[in-house]
Amino acid sequence: MAVAPRLFGGLCFRFRDQNPEVAVEGRLPISHSCVGCRRERTAMATVAANPAAAAAAVAAAAAVTEDREPQHEELPGLDSQWRQIENGESGRERPLRAGESWFLVEKHWYKQWEAYVQGGDQDSSTFPGCINNATLFQDEINWRLKEGLVEGEDYVLLPAAAWHYLVSWYGLEHGQPPIERKVIELPNIQKVEVYPVELLLVRHNDLGKSHTVQFSHTDSIGLVLRTARERFLVEPQEDTRLWAKNSEGSLDRLYDTHITVLDAALETGQLIIMETRKKDGTWPSAQLHVMNNNMSEEDEDFKGQPGICGLTNLGNTCFMNSALQCLSNVPQLTEYFLNNCYLEELNFRNPLGMKGEIAEAYADLVKQAWSGHHRSIVPHVFKNKVGHFASQFLGYQQHDSQELLSFLLDGLHEDLNRVKKKEYVELCDAAGRPDQEVAQEAWQNHKRRNDSVIVDTFHGLFKSTLVCPDCGNVSVTFDPFCYLSVPLPISHKRVLEVFFIPMDPRRKPEQHRLVVPKKGKISDLCVALSKHTGISPERMMVADVFSHRFYKLYQLEEPLSSILDRDDIFVYEVSGRIEAIEGSREDIVVPVYLRERTPARDYNNSYYGLMLFGHPLLVSVPRDRFTWEGLYNVLMYRLSRYVTKPNSDDEDDGDEKEDDEEDKDDVPGPSTGGSLRDPEPEQAGPSSGVTNRCPFLLDNCLGTSQWPPRRRRKQLFTLQTVNSNGTSDRTTSPEEVHAQPYIAIDWEPEMKKRYYDEVEAEGYVKHDCVGYVMKKAPVRLQECIELFTTVETLEKENPWYCPSCKQHQLATKKLDLWMLPEILIIHLKRFSYTKFSREKLDTLVEFPIRDLDFSEFVIQPQNESNPELYKYDLIAVSNHYGGMRDGHYTTFACNKDSGQWHYFDDNSVSPVNENQIESKAAYVLFYQRQDVARRLLSPAGSSGAPASPACSSPPSSEFMDVN
């Protein structure tokens, strides 16, 4: 019976015996992937992720050769890898199925793998190495995921088969557990549950000792109860029940054990108390004071102004609170709910609705907020309903208040739709008919299928005009809208911060703030920097540095949009631009990494790893000095600002010791691919993906001499050829030097501590331009509306099919306002998205509090006898403070009863003056038409909700109702 291959520091002994020159390094080459070694690596990763499975995993690794000689299994071809991962039943295109496992893979590593397999060269230096998910974890003790990870930006999802393929081919970083998540089935959608609910289980008599347990949103309360009983070793004959402690400190009994964690509205971090019935038959909770879910004791006798009520932040739910406060201060809609008009219009059978649950939950919230008995309320039930019907709002991540508002208005409309059975309506083009006729027909068709208090209050009508650029065919349609999303005038400039690294080693790096064109190129960045430094743009190279590596080396013609605001951009002064023709210039530009040899341990084997540190360099080396010794001297000169040159006494002291070490280690030269030992760097960060490598001309002029040579001269560091990752985990023949044009400076810890000044190395100076702030002139709201109605050409991704040409055309499109609603919601598009970047526009938009006149924007023939039909007054503003991925939402709103403005910041409410309302944070504006405001103030209008037939008042539409 054969014996499974033993591993030494990750190296198969059987392979090591056949390849003694690689045994020193202690790692397998990429092509070596025998089943025994591969399963051994898998077993080692499993031990770290799940100690309980260690024995089984190791046994599986050994069992491969129990009955036969081990078989060598080569990596499949790159095309085959791509097909197995990206396509087919087992790949990323596989549809989600409830209960199946999917796995998270760090985005940068996956992009590196894509570049590797699409490159077509199995020996490429872009080999991604082991799967490394370190950047996804909050810590490496409990292996908790970071909060706020976004699919497509931070990670990709792979089905189980694809994941196991990648692990079997490339391995998983030592010690890291797989990030396995289940597919759950939610209403109308299946979703990978990246963030399960973490509950804190405690006993009623020992609240200080908790067990943190993860549950799926689809797990039942019965499973939570069974888990708690198991954790606390409850005897089978003992009766138990659960209580949930909410954010206000009150307790809710979990009666129904059949409902899910989602339906019970349990959330991560929530305390679940299990109580056990006492021997006398009573429950301990009978002696506890259980508070009401939404009202504290101090609120019971509180009498305040109706509507002046805060909303508790349940955890990143300020976006929801802001939208709710704005909507709550829409007078006619609030009266509609306070007067129970909605009860007669609830539509429980609408397949597009939510069985009336959203409308009822919102009604309860409005009634509490306008009762005058609460300083603040907890919108716990409402949040649960929203998450139940819109899975994108599940959990407690940041969201957009306008997106929540859009969902809520649509949900309320469908829940309150008076049309119980929607008829089919054929949409017709104008075909030369008068606009008035086509518009009335479009509105009547809309009302045949959509008739609710939301339509009465918020819906208006667009006129859309499309013109074919080839045949001149004109298409006119009229479409309803619920809000206007208006663009902001965007500056064509952007500010980039870069670090300039001069060639003169005496000068420190300089931080610069550059103003460059948004749609410019890398060459524009170099020109802007040249004005500050006096260095010609031809002597600059631009790089994105990430985790001590070159993540990307930019070409001059690449767009600046590929640089994100969070990228660390370094611009290096070199002796001239690199050409692709060998011998075309006298200098060679070499990318250089800094590494430190650090002790590491892998089970019972100790070895030395190499860890990157500091900032990489691009060094110009004269061709006639491009030998290992010449390169060493050039690097000593470039590092001279923070590396101390050894004196003669240091060299004498180190001679004897150096000779001993050389005899012991016999370090091979880079040209033979040797390295003392070079496992994967252990620091966090994705594999580098230098997608546009410049043609560095690393000839064989380095020769085959060893470095450092045997001589009685003290060398501070050794040099090693590496790949773009900064690793040398593959053999490198002299012919491969062109494919690995990177040099690593390897430091021993003692030498680095003695001669390398880390403080000086990290030092830099700020150029005067760093204090520059690009001024942004304010814009008027009317300018945004004008921009909204400007003629635009359709993009290539969204062409229009011309019925005359019978082809898709990039037509011109113009939107005009035809009919305005009672309440006009204006969404300022502050968030800008491109292929490479996302940004928030903090431009100050000046908007009027009163008398916003739309008469110049409405193209429908106007009613001159009633100018109030086109004038609006502001009633609410949703504000957003912060950036793209984080921030805070608040609200300004005018109370319908008192006319006083208030500032709502979650559960805090305070009065404000009108001059405080306008700010750069304004995001969504609510305007009320003046004729509606006047009608609501009249005695007849103040008694109910005039927009609803259920309240015996006709709708205010400019067209007749069609039912």
From Swiss-Prot:
Enzyme class comes to: hydrolase
Which residues catalyse the reaction?
C318 (nucleophile), H888 (proton acceptor)
Extract the SUPFAM superfamilies matched here.
Cysteine proteinases (SSF54001), DUSP-like (SSF143791)
InterPro entries per the record?
DUSP-like_sf, Papain-like_cys_pep_sf, Pept_C19_DUSP, Peptidase_C19_UCH, Ub_carboxyl-term_hydrolase, Ub_USP-typ, USP_C, USP_CS
Checking SMART domains in the record gives: DUSP
* Record-annotated DUSP domain positions: 76-184
Q: Where is the composition biased (Acidic residues)?
A: 649-665
Q: Where is the composition biased (Basic and acidic residues)?
A: 65-75
Question: According to the UniProt record, what happens if one changes C318S?
Answer: Loss of deubiquitinase activity
Record's protein name: Ubiquitin carboxyl-terminal hydrolase 11
Species name? Homo sapiens
